[in-house]
């Protein structure tokens, strides 16, 4: 109603883009074309001619396949064989010793290690569970290789957001989120303002560099629209 475009920028690489559109639509938020995922950022580092080992969920698998690259899903193709140009990692519940071993072999063979995000945990109604970043960290430890991280708060995700907002000055953008270590850092990567929502993840605004601090998303909107 205010004439402001809203992008939903998420480190969720597990759900497909359509699933994320549907989830937002179910709560009355039409968002088709306005969702940016860490899976989308991960594939910006992939070439269509590559052979890619995917250690991730269906959202990441879908995005890798869409590039045209030969896509091998690590837990669907055992035993994994041959060489790879990249290993792309995201949250998935199938992670086990064999996935770690296959990723190790591929990376040691020269594959580029790409992490969709470095979030250590993933929120659920029953509390946090290990996130995609924990899986990336395990593969980094095993291989001795530092992954290229593409999601928030890193540069590839920022580049993707800029591409989706042609003609928009970053000085006019506001990153809204509840974590300074990802959302605030992403705002700094983009070079835009940061609005911190005190949702419980960050209980107060102390020691956080934010342009706006509010107890809720509605509070952020009110401050942004108040002259």
Please identify what each model-predicted range represents.
Residues 2, 12-34, 39-227:
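Asp-based, Mg2+/Mn2+-dependent phosphohydrolase catalytic module
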Residues 5:
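N-terminal phosphate-binding loop and flanking beta/alpha elements of the actin-like ATPase fold
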């Amino acid at each position: 109603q205010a004439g402001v475009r809203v992008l939903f920028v998420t480190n969720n690489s597990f759900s497909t883009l359509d699933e994320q559109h549907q989830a937002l639509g179910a709560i009355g938020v039409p968002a088709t074309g306005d969702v940016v995922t860490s899976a989308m950022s991960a594939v910006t580092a992939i070439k269509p001619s590559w052979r890619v080992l995917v250690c991730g969920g269906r959202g990441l698998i879908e995005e890798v396949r869409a590039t045209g690259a030969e896509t091998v899903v690590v837990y669907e193709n055992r035993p994994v064989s041959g060489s790879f140009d990249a290993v792309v990692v995201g949250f998935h519940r199938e992670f086990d010793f064999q996935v770690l071993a296959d990723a190790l072999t591929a990376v040691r063979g020269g594959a580029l290690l790409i992490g969709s995000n470095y979030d250590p945990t993933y929120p659920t109604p029953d509390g946090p569970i290990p996130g995609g970043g924990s899986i990336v960290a395990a593969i980094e430890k095993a291989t001795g290789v530092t992954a290229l991280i593409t999601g928030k708060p890193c540069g590839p995700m920022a580049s993707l957001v800029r591409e989706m907002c042609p003609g928009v000055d970053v000085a006019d953008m506001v990153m809204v989120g509840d974590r300074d270590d990802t959302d605030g850092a992403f705002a700094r990567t983009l070079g835009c303002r940061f609005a911190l929502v005190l949702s419980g993840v960050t209980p107060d605004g102390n020691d956080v560099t934010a342009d706006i601090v509010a107890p809720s998303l509605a509070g952020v909107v009110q401050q942004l629209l108040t002259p």
